[in-house]
């Protein structure tokens, strides 16, 4: 068996920062801080190896583990000068989880372990403060009871509140020694009621606590968190056992969390909060609203504890310069002595990540490549958060702490269950006293989070920032009744289902729906995206059909349009009647008449698009979807169509019935339409090329056209369509006495097209892989119907991910690789692109880079994500 226990503390450490897979994120940090000679409580880390052994051996420990554990405790007793379980000089322990990947609040912690009546009395004698000793005992009974014995936490809360009410006490700090003794007696009774015993033996407490932490690795909340954040279950958790240091030892003791820069904005100054006379869980749980570390008022640590603040500032600077990244630091102050409990790379908003990365490049701490690799591409969604338009003279009903930026409007809900249930049909704002790890699913589906208690480093704030959701915490001027499902702000009562708006940037709360403004990129955001473009070889284009789409795409840095779905232009209310006439017309003459009516409308659409894009490439796909998408379904629409064609309604119904397809997505669509009804594609070709000519002649705009044929399955279809297309173009060239320049390409979205790509490539200038349909036709799964069984497939690990979100490299990816190799073998100059949902997915973009594609094309709002992902792929793979 590998070594299971590593020491750290004032005498150095057995480990270091590189050992995260063995020691976990927290343990590796403690080891490294020991090596840096920073003030940390002595302790040891039990490696992730124990967790993996535990789960593969029926929840049992290895043979000699108990002996190794006792040896480790003995070493700790020697370095601290205290004895575990002693009735004269007791050593108390903290037992904390520590995954290899940070999972804040998702797993269990037990503080003050080793407590019993005798130890409590000894602690009183050694420190001379009975209230402190009793408070520590009370905390242990509650934490051990909920974490190890699975006693519902609200039962402890009820006992605590009952005694406070009976004694007419409102502040925790006013609780007397006598009242604490009564609360402890009731907590003990609760232990005995649930487990038939009170565990007083310190070693029995320790072993059961270790097992509880190991069990928490597979707790529901931890499993959900890993699933949401794509963290492997195979990592396991380490366990960190340390000598307790006490932040609840009076007015010269405290606990807190500090960030070396702002996790919301990235501003370069120490940021964080602390609580005097408290333990760590008080600040993280959000049950008390903390005070700032640095501020201009007398309640800040800077003002109240200037010497400790100075030392903390120096340590924060040292840690950031050592790790070359922003740090999240947990600390405790015991009688004015500072101890660092943990440091880790801090979670941050997207804008903070960008600002910090740019700052650190400018400070010459890291390179541009390192800066880019620190940006989570998906987190850039946060840059697209809306904000409230305050120019409208709005009045808020309450204000709290701005815990996570962005504005959100939705109906108020008061439980995670209701959030999940109602989010299917509404945007929801989850309103709670404070959130806990059990709320993770409800938080995930909510548009925003509002808590009455807690600060900027509470569970709600940290998780919301990680998810990129707006959050307001610490709204002390609001009151909530979760059972009655009402929120009160003065005379205003908000019930479940009422619409509210929260602003996570200012902390303001509003009744009703507020006007919102779309965000703009900061200069730092533009700069880091420019760095991405400098490095990446895979260009990023947009899927766009409208002028608005094109403008948004250019704003976000698109290098062209990689997919213009021309049929989207047909769904305009002025065009759809003409499209229906074209489809339903019983003879060629009437069809041509409808086509001619559509021609000028489609031409204006293309002109508007080309005008915005100027000389950037615009890849237009000819009409693709099945005709049923355009056909009338209501009686009113059918009657209107009959009138416009001057046909009886019965004939319209006959035509509709004749055109019915059992499986339209694999039926009369794409190039099959263009071959069987050539006048449709002829009209589109004339509209496109006439638009190009008129822009050239009248506005001196030189368009960069790429023309694409959809749903090709064999080279015969290509040859037929090419003949028809060039016939129209040649006629237009003669009419306008102008030579058109363009590229002709095809979608590769059917397996047969991929396999037959050698012949197809000879006929075209480029391939664009339509990965949506290629995935559908490879799997034989409809993208619209996969939701009915996908959750089960993911849960059973039949699929590792949704194949319509992340490209299946083994199946669909192999077809793409076959197609590009065979295509290039017959056409060395063949250009390659990809469009569809996968083109905006970072993991899929990495695959496209490895395949040496020229570009990807995604929705406008995925462009920043794709630009960063493209650069990261280049940095990783060259």
Swiss-Prot record:
The modification Phosphothreonine is found at residue 457. SUPFAM superfamilies: Glutathione synthetase ATP-binding domain-like, Phosphoenolpyruvate/pyruvate domain, Phosphohistidine domain. Activated by light-induced dephosphorylation. Inhibited by dark-induced phosphorylation. Both reactions are catalyzed by PDRP1. Its EC number is 2.7.9.1. ATP binds at residue 96. The reaction takes place in three steps, each mediated by a carrier histidine residue located on the surface of the central domain. The two first partial reactions are catalyzed at an active site located on the N-terminal domain, and the third partial reaction is catalyzed at an active site located on the C-terminal domain. For catalytic turnover, the central domain swivels from the concave surface of the N-terminal domain to that of the C-terminal domain. One of its GO terms (molecular function) is ATP binding. Phosphorylation of Thr-457 in the dark inactivates the enzyme. Dephosphorylation upon light stimulation reactivates the enzyme. It catalyses: pyruvate + phosphate + ATP = phosphoenolpyruvate + AMP + diphosphate + H(+). Residues 348-404 are annotated as: Linker 1. Mg(2+) binds at residues 749, 773. It comes from Rickettsia felis (strain ATCC VR-1525 / URRWXCal2) (Rickettsia azadi). InterPro entries: ATP_grasp_subdomain_1, PEP-util_enz_mobile_dom, PEP_util_AS, PEP_util_C, PEP_util_CS, Phosphohistidine_dom_sf, PPDK_AMP/ATP-bd, Pyruvate_phosphate_dikinase. The active site is at 459 (tele-phosphohistidine intermediate), 835 (proton donor). This is Pyruvate, phosphate dikinase. Belongs to the PEP-utilizing enzyme family. Residues 538-878 are annotated as: C-terminal. Its cofactor is Mg(2+). Homodimer. Residues 503-537 are annotated as: Linker 2. Keywords: ATP-binding, Kinase, Magnesium, Metal-binding, Nucleotide-binding, Phosphoprotein, Transferase. The N-terminal domain contains the ATP/Pi active site, the central domain the pyrophosphate/phosphate carrier histidine, and the C-terminal domain the pyruvate active site. The gene is ppdK.
